[in-house]
Amino acid sequence: MKNIYQIQNLQHHYNGHPALDIDSFSIQPGTITGIIGPNGSGKSTLLKMLAFIDKPRKGNILFKGESAEPFAENVRFQTTLLSQEPYLMKRSVFKNISYGLELRRDTHDLPNRVNDALSLVGLPGNDFFHRKWYELSGGEAQRVALASRLILKPEVLLLDEPTASIDAASAQIIKDTVLLAQNKWGTTLVIASHDWEWLYDICEHVAHLFRGRFFGTGRQNFIFGPWWEPAPGKWVKKLQDGQSLEVPCPPSKDAIAIINPENMLLSTDKKACTIQGTVTRLVLEKHTREIIIIVQAANQAITARLSPKNAHRYTLHPGQKIRLSYLLEDVTWY
């Protein structure tokens, strides 16, 4: 199957500061891809380029195997971006939602199509058609912005923190609606979000972006420096509660340590490093049926994984204090 996106040797910077540096990255059509990373990691910049709003300084982004320029005809009506802060034009809800179709000169049965788009995001057309942009709450504005994109039935819907600054009810509607678009029309979804558990639950692929580079996929424990050497040959990260998270010698003091959740064990192996924390969440992973354990150890979140056959050996619940162990040899570096 041909990739809908193929990134090749992409580099971008702002005022001399590197923003993105991606050698290769691809997305297949009809899939859901999650992008996770801290603020300033380059997520928003990347989504703007995948929407063909901005152009990288170097490298190529192929769309369905072909080069594309910002706002070019072969991508203009096929990709659309929903940003964290929705931009609505200074006009009625109806005019905001119908605008894209009017640009396409595709205006047949417009009232019913606008009403259907509003229904998808849980807003009644009779109540909202004539409302002005300034009469909407934050959650309503985000839902109207999403409806204005869904009415186009896009091939690709890119979402940048779509639920970060709205009420819980609107956030859930948006989550449900974008999945409906993917199921109903085969829309390719690319989602940047701090809601890691939502992404892990719905995405075929989750990629981690840091300082403009992809450095891992799937559930991993990423532990950021700086690292401290309290004794010769012993390297640790000091946590806020006084615990030390031990690692092998890092390649640099700001290197990122990576530990696979499968190597975080509920045991007290005397040869292993240990860390104590509180269970904050238990998640049943749909694809593997494994139990995902989210543990908070002071200021560090840690993920462990239990296979179905081992899950019955433990009685776990949120709020419970547990001790996790790992081996130094299981720590890798980025």
Where do the model's predicted regions map?
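Conserved ABC ATPase signature
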Residues: 132-136, 140
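The feature captures the beta-strand-to-loop junction immediately N-terminal to the Walker
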Residues: 36-38
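Non-catalytic connector elements of ABC transporters
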Residues: 237-334
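Catalytic Walker B motif of ABC-type/P-loop ATPase nucleotide-binding domains
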Residues: 157-161
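ABC ATPase NBD coupling module
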Residues: 67-80, 91, 103
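Conserved ABC ATPase "signature" region
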Residues: 109-127
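Helix-to-loop junction immediately C-terminal to a conserved catalytic motif
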Residues: 51
